[in-house]
Amino acid sequence: MENYYTLSGNQEGVASCYRIAEDSEGVISMWVFQRGLHSSRSVLARTRYTKPKPKPPRRSKVRAPTQTTHHDTDLKVTAPIPPAAANLECNPEHPLWQFFDGGRFMRSAEELDDKSRPWTVPELRRKSFDDLHSLWYACLKERNILAREMHLRRNMQEEGSAHAQLDERVRTTMWRIRHVLSERDWAYRLAHAELGTQQAPLLREVEEAFLAVPEAEDGEAFDMLARLQRAVFGISEYIEENLVDRRFVDGLKYIATLKLRRFAPRDAAVEQLLQASEGGITDAGEAFVIFTAENTLADVKEAADAVNELREQGNKVDRYEEIATVAQYLKKLANAKKVAA
C-alpha cells in the first residue's frame, strides 16, 4: 500500500507542488509540479534595461542653431500715431479715383459748371456711333461723381441743389443719346425688312456689274464687292467687327461663288471647281477658304485646290453647325493675324 504526501511552495514567482509517495517496500518517489504566475512573473523578471542608462558624455563641438528666435529682438515701443488722412497712402491709379473729380473730396456749388446745357437731338444725330458712345460714358462718369457728392451732402444735411441741377442736365443728354440710337436701330430694321423684298433683283444687278468689269480693273471690281458684302450681309473687312449669324454665313457662300465666277474664265481648275459645285458654293468651310483668299488669280487657284482636297477627304461642315464653326474659324484667323503682327 502506498502513502502520498503533498507539499506546496512559492519561490521567485513560481508555484511548486511536491508529491511524495512511499510504497510497501519503503521506496520513496517524488514528483515536482510547477505552475508559473504570469502576471507577477513578467513584472518581477530581470531585464537588460532594469538599470538606467548613463548620461552621454558632453560633446565638445556642437553646431550653433540656425535661428535663435522667431521674433525680432530690436523692437522698440513708440508713442501711438493718431489716425489722420495724411498717414494713409493710396495708389493714384486706383480705379475708385474715377468717382472723384480731380481727386477732390467734394466740389462746392461755385466749382460746378452752371453754364452748360444738354445736347439737343439734332446735334446728336450728326454724331457717329463712336462719338455717341464716348459721350454716353463721359456723362455716366459725371453722374457717378455727382451721385457720390449728393449722397455725402445728404448725410451732412447740406443743400445740394446745384449738384442736382447739373445731374438733371447730364441725365437729359443721356436719354437723348438713347433716343438717337433707337432711331438708327429702327431705321436699320425697316431698311433691312424692305431690302428683303428687293434683295434678289439688287444682287442680280450688282452681280452683272461685277462680272462685267474688265480684268485690268480687278481692284475696282472687288471694291464694289466689299461695299456689297458690308451693306447686304454685314461682313466687315475688320475681323473683330463681324457678328457671325445666318446672314453672315450666307454672305460668305455668295461672295465665294462670285469670286470663282470672276476667275473661272482665266483658269481651267477654277472653272472645273465651279462646274462641280453646280454653279455655287454651299459648304461653309469651302466658302471660308475661298473668301479669305486674296483677290488674285494665283490665290484663288490655290484656294480651289484646297477645296478639292477637302472634298476628296470628305470634310464638310454640317448646316446646323455652320455658325459655330465659322465663328471658330474667324477667332483662329484673328489670333493668327495678331501673332503675325
Curated annotation (Swiss-Prot):
Residues 44-74 are annotated as: Disordered. Keywords: Mitochondrion, Ribonucleoprotein, Ribosomal protein, Transit peptide. It is found in: Mitochondrion. InterPro entries: MRP-L47_sf, Ribosomal_uL29_mit. Residues 48-62 have a biased composition (Basic residues). Belongs to the universal ribosomal protein uL29 family. This is Large ribosomal subunit protein uL29m. It comes from Eremothecium gossypii (strain ATCC 10895 / CBS 109.51 / FGSC 9923 / NRRL Y-1056). The lineage of its organism: Eukaryota, Fungi, Dikarya, Ascomycota, Saccharomycotina. The gene is MRPL4.
